[in-house]
């Protein structure tokens, strides 16, 4: 509250509060009341509910927006019990962020920088034994007013030896507080099956700041994951899991979710993966209990995806969206904009494509990418033509810049790029996505599907809101629609398929090309780099 900008926070970030109010169904005044009275009341309760003085060490792990609440409670504990050692760690304390937090917030005694499995236990043992003069590598401390730190460059190599998380205290306290009125029916269990990113080891996505200094991919064996999920499900009486892996081990598709599918389990699982999944893989995930996934779809522009180093194409993203819809898997995705080297054409292509995709799940949001610490854009900005202008705007309203070096604790940053994209195109694309989201939230939900008869297919197109259409396609168009249904096909593959199913009829390449052009113009097929993919979903449930 000593920050002179603190009072301006709600006004400066009014659009954020308005969006939060819409999503939560609460008025903005509710959040003002929560900050002004609810948070202090909670801190008072937290200090009285637990005898903090009985402990020698109190630890906090902090990620994203957990920071201020954790620092506030830690200060109260330290003020009342000065002999208690306060230890911080987590993603918000990686790299120089941890060292600056330790310097600025004097009630913090130690910071674990990076992974803590091999560092935190010996630190606690040394504190308990009164041997705090020799600290493990990777632990920062304060000595005679100076910050002392020797980095630990060794990654935690025995990730497979970690067991399932222990949620006993959490659920016991939730029950005591009456926090589970649904009797645990909505209970969700978080689980980590792997750490790091196997794609990032080879190609670090240019905007991504996840994994910090621990990109190396490490994963538990599928059999171990099965055993641990079984244990957690039984112990905490829940079949809902959220895998916190940045990207799942691809072995999990068949060897984990394939097993769940074969056993006909009724699970509800969230995963993060890559979008270049085949139809069969999405089917296996869905039948194995995946109800929602984040496949890293960030754009529908080939040039932008190349700029990000995503290693996927718009066609693969569209495939993922289509088969996820067919198998009832919610997809969490976004359209990111504002990249270096992007052009008006990148925007026009997406503006042209989106009307074809209105029946598919829309992105959750659209906007300029965040410039995140640890990303290639942050570590090598000049290589990409980026000028970092300072920490994210919100930091100066949350932390007092007279006390904290915001450049050192910030995770996201403001930046400038020499944009050449027309503001009108930016707004047109943004509005198109807003309209797409509105259609899906309304009773007028778009659709595009086809049914198969003995010798023709019928396409039902409800993407245009004012004129839904029913179109019959006889052979050879019907064959093309079916051939390109599961995966993209080239003209040569389509021509060969027609020859097999043509009952002696011959179609020369020119006539096939005309048919393809007509189906693309109708937005029944999507064409990309010489391949064609059917956008309509089959009504048949046996694919």
Q: Which stretches of residues belong to each language-model region?
A:
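N-terminal [4Fe-4S]-dependent radical SAM core
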Residues: 142-194, 454-473, 519-543
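Long, charge-rich, low-complexity alpha-helical segments
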Residues: 471-543
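Conserved SAM/AdoMet-binding glycine-rich loop
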Residues: 57, 83-87, 222-332, 337-352, ...
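Flexible loop/turn segments at secondary-structure boundaries
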Residues: 66-68, 94-96, 120, 147-148, ...
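Glycine-rich beta-alpha loop elements in corrinoid/cobalamin-binding modules
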Residues: 32-155
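Canonical Radical SAM [4Fe-4S] cluster-binding loop centered on the CxxxCxxC motif
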Residues: 183-223
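C-terminal accessory regions of radical SAM enzymes
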Residues: 1-4, 140-151, 345-477
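Conserved N-terminal ligand/cofactor-binding loop architecture of enzyme catalytic domains
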Residues: 1-44
């Amino acid at each position: 509250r000593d920050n002179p900008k603190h009072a301006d926070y709600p006004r400066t970030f009014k659009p954020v509060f308005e969006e939060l109010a819409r999503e939560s169904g609460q008025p903005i005044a509710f959040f003002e009341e929560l900050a002004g009275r609810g948070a202090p009341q909670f801190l008072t309760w937290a200090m009285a509910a637990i005898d903090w003085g009985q402990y020698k060490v109190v630890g906090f792990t902090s990620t994203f927006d957990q920071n201020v609440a954790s620092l506030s409670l830690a200060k109260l504990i330290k003020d009342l019990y000065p002999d208690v050692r306060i230890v911080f760690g987590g993603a918000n304390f990686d790299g120089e962020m941890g060292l600056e937090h330790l310097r600025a917030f004097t009630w913090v005694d130690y910071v674990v920088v990076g992974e803590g499995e091999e560092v935190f236990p010996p630190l606690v043992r040394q504190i308990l034994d009164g041997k705090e003069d020799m600290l493990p590598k990777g632990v920062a401390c304060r000595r005679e007013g100076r910050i002392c730190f020797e980095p630990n460059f060794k990654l935690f190599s025995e990730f497979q030896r970690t067991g399932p998380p222990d949620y006993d205290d959490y659920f016991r306290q939730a029950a005591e507080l009456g926090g589970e009125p649904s009797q645990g029916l909505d209970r969700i269990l978080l689980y980590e099956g792997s750490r790091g990113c196997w794609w990032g080891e080879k190609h670090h996505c240019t905007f991504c700041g996840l994994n910090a200094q621990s990109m190396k991919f490490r994963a538990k064996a599928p059999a171990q994951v099965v055993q641990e999920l079984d244990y957690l499900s039984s112990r905490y009486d829940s079949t809902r899991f959220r895998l916190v892996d940045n990207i799942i081990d691809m072995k999990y598709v068949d060897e984990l979710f394939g097993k769940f599918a074969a056993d006909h389990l009724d699970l509800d699982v969230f995963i993060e993966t890559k979008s270049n999944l085949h139809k069969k893989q999405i089917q296996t995930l869905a039948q194995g209990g995946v109800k929602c996934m984040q496949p890293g779809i960030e754009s529908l522009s080939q040039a932008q995806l190349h700029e990000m180093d995503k290693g996927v194409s718009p066609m693969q993203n569209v495939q993922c969206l289509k088969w996820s819809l067919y198998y009832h898997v919610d997809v969490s995705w976004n359209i990111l904009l504002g990249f270096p080297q992007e052009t008006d054409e990148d925007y026009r292509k997406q503006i042209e494509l989106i009307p074809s995709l209105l029946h598919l799940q829309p992105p959750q949001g659209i906007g300029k990418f965040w410039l995140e610490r640890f990303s290639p854009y942050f570590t090598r900005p000049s290589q990409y033509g980026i000028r970092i202008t300072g920490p994210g705007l919100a930091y100066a309203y949350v932390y007092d810049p007279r006390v904290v070096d915001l450049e050192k604790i910030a995770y996201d940053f403001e930046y400038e790029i020499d944009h050449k994209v027309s503001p009108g195109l930016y707004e047109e694309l943004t509005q198109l996505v807003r309209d797409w989201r509105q259609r899906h939230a309304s009773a007028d939900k778009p659709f595009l599907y086809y049914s198969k008869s003995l010798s023709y297919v019928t396409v039902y197109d409800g993407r245009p809101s004012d004129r839904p259409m029913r179109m019959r396609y006889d052979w050879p168009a019907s064959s093309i629609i079916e051939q390109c249904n599961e995966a993209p096909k080239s003209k040569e593959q389509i021509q060969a398929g027609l020859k097999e199913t043509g009952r002696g009829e011959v179609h020369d390449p020119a006539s096939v090309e005309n048919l393809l052009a007509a189906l693309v113009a109708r937005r029944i097929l999507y064409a990309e780099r010489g391949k064609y993919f059917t956008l309509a979903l089959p009504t048949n449930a046996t694919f």
